[in-house]
Design a protein with these regions (language model features):
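Long, well-structured alpha-helical subdomains associated
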Residues: 38, 51-154
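Accessory "access/gating" subregions that flank catalytic or transport cores
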Residues: 1-3
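Active-site recognition of the HExxH zinc-binding catalytic motif
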Residues: 5-22, 46, 51
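Post-HEXXH active-site segment of zinc metalloproteases
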Residues: 21-44
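Conserved helix-loop functional segments at active or binding sites
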Residues: 17-25, 55-60
Length: 210
C-alpha cells in the first residue's frame, strides 16, 4: 500500500496542506511572527492535513484510493520514520536541525506521548530491537487532528512561544540509545540514508530534418 499512500500524502501536503488556513487580521506573516521555527511548523501543518485526510472514507468514495488500508500504511510509515528511520541521517549525539526532520519527529513524538494512556502507539521490544506499532488508527487520526488544530492556531495568531515549545520539546532532541540502535540496524542494510534525483539531459536526435 505504501507506493500510492506516499504519493497521496505528498499530493495533499503540497496542494491542500500548504494552501490551506488563514492568518488572523493584523497578524504578520509566519516568517515574521514564528521566525526560525516557521518552516518546521509549516511543514508539520501541511503533513498533518495530509495525514488527517488519508484516513477519510471520502477519499475511498471518490475513488482516490481503493481502501483505508492505504491510510493505515501511511500512518505506520510516518510514525516509524518520524521516531526511528530518519535518525539514520544524523551522527550519534547530534540534534535535529533540518525543518522536515524536526516536524516529523515533533508530530510522531507528540502523538506517541498524547496517546500513551490509551496505548494508541505502542513501543515494543523484540529480539533486542525497538518497534513502534500503531494499535488504533482512528484514535491516532483524532490526535493528528488535535495537533493540526493547534498548529493552525499558532500560525494564524503568530504564537511564537507555543510554536517554539512544540519544536524544542518534541522535534530537536534525540533519544541517544534509540539513535545508536537505529545507526547499527541501518548500517547492515548498506544503503545511503538519503536518496537523490538525477534529472535526465535530453538531446534531440534528428533524422531527415525532423
Amino acid at each position: 500500500y505504501a507506493g500510492l499512500a506516499d504519493k497521496l500524502h505528498t499530493d495533499m501536503h503540497e496542494v491542500i496542506g500548504h494552501a490551506s488556513g488563514q492568518i488572523e487580521p493584523g497578524i504578520g506573516q509566519p516568517h515574521e511572527t514564528l521566525k526560525n521555527y516557521a518552516s518546521a511548523l509549516e511543514e508539520g501543518r501541511a503533513d498533518l492535513v495530509a495525514l488527517y485526510y488519508l484516513m477519510d472514507q471520502k477519499l475511498v468514495d471518490l475513488g482516490v484510493m481503493p481502501s483505508l488500508e492505504y491510510g493505515k500504511a501511511s500512518y505506520d510509515e510516518y510514525i516509524t520514520k518520524g521516531l526511528m528511520v530518519q535518525l539514520s541521517r544524523l551522527k550519534l549525539g547530534d540534534n535535529i536541525e533540518e525543518a522536515h526532520m524536526r516536524n516529523r519527529q515533533m508530530i510522531a513524538k507528540w502523538a506517541f506521548e498524547k496517546g500513551q494512556k490509551e496505548n494508541v502507539i505502542e513501543k515494543k521490544f523484540e529480539n533486542g530491537k525497538t518497534y513502534f506499532v500503531v494499535n488504533d488508527y482512528l484514535k491516532l487520526r483524532v490526535l493528528f487532528g488535535e495537533l493540526l488544530k493547534e498548529l493552525q492556531r499558532i500560525k494564524s495568531q503568530g504564537d511564537y512561544k507555543a510554536g517554539k515549545a512544540l519544536i524544542e520539546n518534541y522535534g530537536v532532541k534525540v533519544d541517544l540509545a534509540l539513535h545508536k540502535e537505529v545507526l547499527e540496524r541501518y548500517k547492515k542494510l548498506e544503503m545511503a540514508p538519503y536518496q537523490g534525483f538525477i534529472q535526465p539531459k535530453l538531446i534531440p536526435v534528428m533524422k531527415d530534418g525532423k
